[in-house]
């Protein structure tokens, strides 16, 4: 009996500790977000950028934060970083009309007219561009529950309509599971990078005195093949490749699946640039 009481007290204390920490974290997030928004409103875009970045580094990032950060960069005249943050936001909220408009508007400012080609798999699974990883995961989880529920019911009621329902759910379960797996793989292996500097030389090798093959400009999206000693080998969709300083590019997916939004369901304030 005493052990049970002690265990209950310990569990209660842990829950209180976690809840209080979560509340404090939420307060910090709200305060930082408010400061960033206020700075943006008065035109202090650099201060807004620093506050949004502080939120992201503390683990409070999300689609809306990346979106607002992209807008702040755009207003501050940093086109490359604006496109980088818009692309990151699009991984989390791909159907957002304001984001898609602003990203398209920012892309129109890029000097290099390079169109990204789509492979056969991307074209075949075209709908994946409209869903983020979380949406696909929870859709798959829900269909999995429905599938098991119908299988259990069919143990006792083998009716014709349940059979067709089972086939329908099974098909949707398979397609959704495959879609989630492909989306996870694509994000995990997303090697797209954005040129962050006004103009960069693409060299034949990872040395300052190597031959300049061509130039790329701020906001251009290319692919990173590998990096070594502060240099990155990048590739264009037309297969042209060369070396550039790693500090001149920004990786869109950061090499890992992006699945989360902000951990605190607070109202977000958005700042369209159009």
Positions of predicted regions on the chain:
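Conserved beta-strand/loop element in small beta-rich adapter and peptidoglycan-binding domains
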Residues: 210-228
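Membrane-embedded alpha-helical segments of integral membrane proteins
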Residues: 112, 116-154
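Boundary regions of SH3-family modules and the immediately adjacent low-complexity/disordered segments
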Residues: 79, 163-197, 204-207, 211, ...
């Amino acid at each position: 009996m005493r052990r049970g009481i002690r265990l209950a007290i310990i569990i209660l204390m842990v829950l209180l500790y976690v809840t209080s920490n979560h509340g404090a974290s939420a307060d910090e997030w709200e305060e930082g977000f408010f400061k960033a928004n206020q700075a943006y409103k008065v035109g202090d875009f650099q201060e807004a950028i620093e506050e949004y970045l502080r939120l992201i580094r503390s683990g409070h990032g999300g689609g809306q934060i990346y979106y607002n950060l992209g807008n702040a960069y755009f207003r501050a005249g940093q086109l490359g970083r604006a496109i980088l943050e818009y692309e990151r936001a699009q991984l989390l909220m791909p159907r957002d009309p304001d984001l898609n408009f602003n990203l398209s508007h920012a892309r129109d400012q890029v000097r290099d007219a390079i169109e990204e080609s789509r492979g056969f798999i991307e074209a075949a699974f075209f709908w994946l561009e409209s869903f983020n990883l979380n949406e696909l995961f929870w859709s798959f989880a829900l269909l999995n529950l429905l599938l098991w529920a119908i299988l259990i019911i069919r143990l006792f009621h083998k009716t014709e309509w349940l059979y067709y329902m089972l086939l329908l759910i099974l098909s949707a379960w398979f397609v959704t599971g495959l879609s989630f797996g492909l989306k996870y793989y694509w994000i995990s292996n997303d090697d797209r990078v954005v040129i962050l500097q006004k103009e960069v030389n693409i060299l034949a090798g990872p040395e300052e005195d190597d031959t300049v093959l061509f130039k790329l400009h701020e906001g251009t999206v290319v692919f990173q093949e590998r990096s070594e000693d502060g240099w990155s080998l990048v590739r264009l969709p037309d297969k042209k490749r060369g070396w550039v300083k790693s500090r001149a590019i920004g990786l869109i997916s950061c090499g890992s699946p992006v699945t989360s939004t902000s951990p605190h369901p607070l109202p977000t304030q958005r700042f369209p640039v159009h």
